């Protein structure tokens, strides 16, 4: 018997498969605008000074590599809660927030999805159209039927809010709705505070289950500003979920540092929720790793390192904004009649460029410039050395018949 004779070759991941093609490309001057990674102006993944200092402190302790609690270490989980909800949060003080360290934002989404599926076996999940490529796969793998809600208007390159409202109002009660808290991936189009108020009201009226995904806190306007949606949900009195990731904001991509936070109605409910959450984690990966979470906790719990980190994060944010402005200006200077103001208006690491799949293919074939077939480009991969070449190539494919 050949056990694996029926195994089919799986399609490559749209993002990491693109990176494989980019790595194999031997042409000089190649540019990878596909993967969601922040690069310095020298084209390198940064090692933040705050992270380096924290890691020195962690290593100096020479702590044994023993198992840590299923939900992760308390210093880390407390730091995550304070970052999301504020250190003076009434929810935290009332014991209404349960947090568990997870394997990146992806792990937090899956653990949260598994938890809800055990609680509500008939629940469906809903993601924005478009959304991060892995959202659909994560929740389908957790057993959900995945619905789509309207989000992006290709004409305005902004949020189709009327369509979003109509979609959410059509969903049955207990639908798990995945919401991008800031820096929407892939479009860069975010909701206003007034729009968030409407979404919260719909979730309450329709008894939807909000699941906020916040992977880019600090990349739009700042730590506090980018956490506004989470805190608005906190003020609503609803129970909800938050997936958070420190891959981007701490440049700790390979450490897989994330967290799942669940807001409950009271302290007693939190204890029951945590007990079941630990069961979900125990049968998945049992315990989380120590190193990445220890670094993040050390930074967030040290006033000096926290300020150093926020300063470095601000520098990353400002560089991305500078690249947005530069790309807009250079495309406009190329004499194309398009309105490129949307590039500067969009927020976070990505821009939904409007490039077609054929145009993206031409960029790859003719210029060794790699982007997703959806037209999503990572603005954080642009720098002073490649932005002219990228702008010229985009202008050429836009002008070609």
Tell me the role of every PLM-derived stretch.
Residues 33, 146, 210, 240, ...:
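Hydrophobic beta-strand scaffold residues
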Residues 52, 57, 62-205, 218-219, ...:
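Conserved core of the PLP fold type I
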Residues 94-96, 342-348, 372-375:
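Short Gly/Ser/Thr- and Asp/Glu-enriched loop/turn motifs at secondary-structure junctions
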Residues 214-215:
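Conserved Walker B
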Residues 229-272, 276:
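Active-site PLP attachment segment
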């Amino acid at each position: 018997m050949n056990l694996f004779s029926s195994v089919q070759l799986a399609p490559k991941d749209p993002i990491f498969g693109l990176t494989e093609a980019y790595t194999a490309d031997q042409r000089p001057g190649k540019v990878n605008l596909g993967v969601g990674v922040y690069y310095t102006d020298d084209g390198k993944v940064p090692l933040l000074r705050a992270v380096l200092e924290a890691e020195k402190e962690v290593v100096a302790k020479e702590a044994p590599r023993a198992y840590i609690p299923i939900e992760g270490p308390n210093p880390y989980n407390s730091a995550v809660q304070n970052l999301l909800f504020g250190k003076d949060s009434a929810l935290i003080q009332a014991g209404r927030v349960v947090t568990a360290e997870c394997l990146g934002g992806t792990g937090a989404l899956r653990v949260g999805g598994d938890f809800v599926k055990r609680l509500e076996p008939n629940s469906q999940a809903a993601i924005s159209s478009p959304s991060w490529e892995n959202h659909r796969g994560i929740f389908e793998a957790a057993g959900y039927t995945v619905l789509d809600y309207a989000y992006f208007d290709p004409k305005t390159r902004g949020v189709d809010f009327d369509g979003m409202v109509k979609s959410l109002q059509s969903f049955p009660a207990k639908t798990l709705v995945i919401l991008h808290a800031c820096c929407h991936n892939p479009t860069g189009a975010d909701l206003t505070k007034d729009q968030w108020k409407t979404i919260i009201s719909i979730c309450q009226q329709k008894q939807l289950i909000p699941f906020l995904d916040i992977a880019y806190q600090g990349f739009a306007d700042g730590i506090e500003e980018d956490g506004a949606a989470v805190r608005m949900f906190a003020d609503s009195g609803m129970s909800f979920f938050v997936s958070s990731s420190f891959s981007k904001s701490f440049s700790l991509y390979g450490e897989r540092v994330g967290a799942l936070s669940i807001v409950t109605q009271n302290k007693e409910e939190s204890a029951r929720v945590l007990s079941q959450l630990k069961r979900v984690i125990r049968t998945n990966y049992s315990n989380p790793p120590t190193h990445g979470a220890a670094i993040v906790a050390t930074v967030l719990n040290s006033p000096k390192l926290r300020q150093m980190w926020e300063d470095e994060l601000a520098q990353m944010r400002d560089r991305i904004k500078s690249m947005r402005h530069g790309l807009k200006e250079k495309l406009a200077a190329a004499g194309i009649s398009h309105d490129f103001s949307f590039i500067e208006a969009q927020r976070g690491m990505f821009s939904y460029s409007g490039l077609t799949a054929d145009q993206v293919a031409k960029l790859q074939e003719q210029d060794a410039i790699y982007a997703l077939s959806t037209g999503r480009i990572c603005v954080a991969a642009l720098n002073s050395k490649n932005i002219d070449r990228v702008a010229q190539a985009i202008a050429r494919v836009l002008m070609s018949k």
